[in-house]
């Protein structure tokens, strides 16, 4: 086991504080509408230019092991805020730095660290409760666009495109962000339910110019097994041919003789048909087949529930207005499912999302929810260069997380004002002793830090602005982009309540633990020889008399 170096008390805390300040100073430069850029060297390719706090934090590793521990703990603050709300990483870092700096001063002055922590925890609970009272629901498109704009560093085009996407696919819809090919941002919305399985044979194509198979007013046969024998399908195929409607078969697989017969029937015009594999695998495939059944008003033909292909009738088949299949995807538009059944399926999936602890399962359930309830929107980010593309894409993703958080828990006045207004919750708050009171007072000063930093980054005097904002009330605050004072909500400067709350909770949780640190342990760096050439090879020895 490698030897360890141990630092106690003040000597360890000073090193930790130095690391906290290095990371926080790099991250906080990006805060606010006039936040600066940070350039990050990459091992290959062009450097990355970003204003995204968590991207900056992730890149920082310090040489001194004790300083690095401080930096990594603040990095954890940013990651926690990011995981919880998807944004607010820079605010969380600024708050953590302020709490640690104020807290360690109090510890050096002889305060009890554990009582300081208890005071900070009490004040945090009171401020979080006050933030909930201050928050207002965010439902209209204008408010959503404003939240997106603020999160994307005052880029109106990003806020507007996110609001448009949310309007089209509802708050439960899936919105994905991709790199576009042009200079402008583009939004494309997929109507209906789309899943990532294409036609099983190119012979099903009936629109050669676009290479798609399009079925108008089709019936849907949903089967939870492989189909290889055409005989078991004959009764249902004959019934469909008599009805004179096209048929889409969604099964685990259609192969061999069955697929060949379907292709021949389709080409001869006996029955217009297309076949596709069911999406997903295992239990997820069963669930997705059931989703399609609910959406189209059909029944999944499964031996588990005593149904077989031979006994299938037209009543078991689903209905849709249109189905479009290409090489990779199938889209079902306007399924004829009963609305109450669809709503009950949606609430069942919502319940599963709440119950699962796996991020992967949650993501897949969210996708299923979106396909049933809203749809899928894709924002294609446009930019003039690859460097700009990466920076812009990160901002769009941040803004998307922020708008989702705003819809979830409402909005509060932005620009650091909500935290300053929430101070009224701890005006009369008292701890159990004098040291806890210091912890409460310490947080009172720390929550002003985001506003101070926004003002400093915009080139104004923080103390003057903070004082003027404190004299005001309600939504009154400072617009750093224009240098004006006024009603933050009227000026469109909104923050999601969830982002502000998560930032404060993550910062006070980790920062208060850092204040209570008494010993730090790190590996002793190994003394490696400086460079060193090759070992001496010795002489060549006598070569003898060569003639």
From Swiss-Prot:
- Give the superkingdom in one word: Bacteria
Any GO molecular function: unfolded protein binding
Against Pfam families, the record matches this protein to: Cpn60_TCP1 (PF00118)
Gene3D superfamilies associated with the record: GroEL, GroEL-like equatorial domain, TCP-1-like chaperonin intermediate domain
Principal cellular location given in the protein's record: cytoplasm
| Record field: catalytic activity | ATP + H2O + a folded polypeptide = ADP + phosphate + an unfolded polypeptide
Q: Which GO terms describe its cellular component?
A: cytoplasm
First-level EC class:
isomerase
What InterPro entries would the database entry show?
Chaperonin_Cpn60_CS, Cpn60/GroEL, Cpn60/GroEL/TCP-1, GroEL-like_apical_dom_sf, GROEL-like_equatorial_sf, TCP-1-like_intermed_sf
CDD domains per UniProt? GroEL
User: What keywords are annotated for this sequence in UniProt?
Assistant: ATP-binding, Chaperone, Cytoplasm, Isomerase, Nucleotide-binding
Subunit organization: Forms a cylinder of 14 subunits composed of two heptameric rings stacked back-to-back. Interacts with the co-chaperonin GroES.
Q: What is this protein called?
A: Chaperonin GroEL
Name its species: Pseudomonas syringae pv. syringae (strain B728a)
Q: Which gene encodes it?
A: groEL
